[in-house]
């Protein structure tokens, strides 16, 4: 089992200027395995395609992923070309991870998607993206998209980029079982993750599929400063339990939690700050503090 630790920027960051370059370069220099960018139109966080392009140009080793990119509402052909280009520029370092998008009226309006149809649109969009990556001439007759002899170039360096999906609800696990190559849940305890992995493996088998055990990951939200009471209460409702079980609030606690996840079979981790560290220097300081204690866990 190869333990790898990446770092996510989240949706609260304001790294939409040259500070992004400083943070990305420091992340690779510190030894993190991967960078993960998030998406929120109404937030100051940078656009994921642009942020990943910056990272691809300023790094040589670190993998580049999304945690997560909203899929429903995007043109699948253009998205396939954008991501294939990114995979080529980065020499095969792309880690695609997609989601349905925030349950927020403004965000859904921004993507032009109704909540009641976004699940079906997600499935078909991903199907078309994969066809564009793999097929010389793309044919597709679906509910939302029709393509006849459409050629999409370039193709990605990775023959079939492996798609990571998150979530832990029954419907989300069913989607991962049908469509995903990797599972990346968040706000879960090690015990919940282990139960979810067992359920996912059984569901995948019903579709004649299996998920590689090396693709069992977890997003670990953390807070190195005290959280406001309102945030703690919101986290408690989301986590369905004690916040301390899913949100480490010290470097030592983060190490202990990762070790517990490793014990139940997880091996890919994304550290995600719940509070924006602020300046580029503050980001680097926080990443450095975590790296000293956590990156030795990588194998």
Where are these regions (language model features)?
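Conserved, mostly hydrophobic/aromatic
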Residues: 27, 31, 55, 86, ...
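Glycine-enriched alpha-helix->loop->beta-strand junction motifs that scaffold or abut catalytic
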Residues: 31, 58-61, 90, 112, ...
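Active-site mouth loops of central-metabolism enzymes
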Residues: 5-18, 69-77, 157-168, 238-252
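Flexible, glycine-rich active-site loops centered on histidine and acidic residues
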Residues: 2-15, 73-139, 186-187, 191-192
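Hydrophobic faces of well-ordered beta-strands that scaffold small-molecule active sites
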Residues: 5-9, 35-37, 63-67, 94-98, ...
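N-terminal beta1-alpha1-beta2 module of alpha/beta enzyme domains
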Residues: 1-59, 160-161, 272-281, 285, ...
